[in-house]
């Protein structure tokens, strides 16, 4: 995804390695892919991410957000954390839209969503998640990432100090 989105700059002057563990404890799969990608964009750009949203979803090379397993457990787990810390009305979970048809949640979570005190944001593309987590239009965030990568490139070439 990074190469496809930012390759017009030439060779990327940053090396990013993401390892998607396929099994960790009782959870399996690449469901942290979207969250990890957002963290990388934040690290490169220096832009902060919202801290009141949990994120789950796999990502393909074109930026599509793919379905993952055990979404109900993840949503309900984050809901319990938010409930314990105090619901603010802004908290929620970003999840793949493809998971919605089969998502079954406990009644208290459904009620919190219906009351607007907890939110579910179903996304199909990385840019939708970018806008939710950065609070800015995706094109603007991508421009900040490009600027940072161009700066890295100039540093690497000795053009800037």
Predicted features, each with a name:
Residues 1-161:
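Peripheral, non-AAA+ core regions of ATP-driven protein-machinery
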């Amino acid at each position: 995804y990074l190469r496809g989105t930012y390759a017009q700059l030439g060779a990327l002057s940053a090396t990013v390695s993401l390892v998607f563990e396929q099994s960790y404890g009782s959870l399996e799969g690449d469901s942290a892919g979207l969250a990890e990608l957002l963290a990388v964009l934040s690290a490169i750009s220096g832009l902060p991410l919202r801290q009141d949203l949990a994120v789950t979803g796999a990502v393909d090379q074109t930026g599509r957000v793919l379905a993952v397993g055990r979404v109900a457990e993840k949503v309900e787990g984050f809901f319990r954390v938010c409930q314990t810390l105090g619901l603010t009305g802004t908290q929620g979970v970003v999840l793949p839209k493809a998971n919605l048809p089969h998502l079954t949640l406990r009644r208290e979570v459904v009620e919190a969503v219906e009351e607007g005190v907890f939110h579910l944001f179903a996304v199909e593309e990385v840019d939708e998640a970018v806008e939710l987590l950065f609070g800015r239009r995706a094109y603007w965030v991508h421009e900040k990432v490009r600027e940072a990568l161009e700066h890295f490139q100039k540093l690497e070439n000795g053009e800037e100090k």
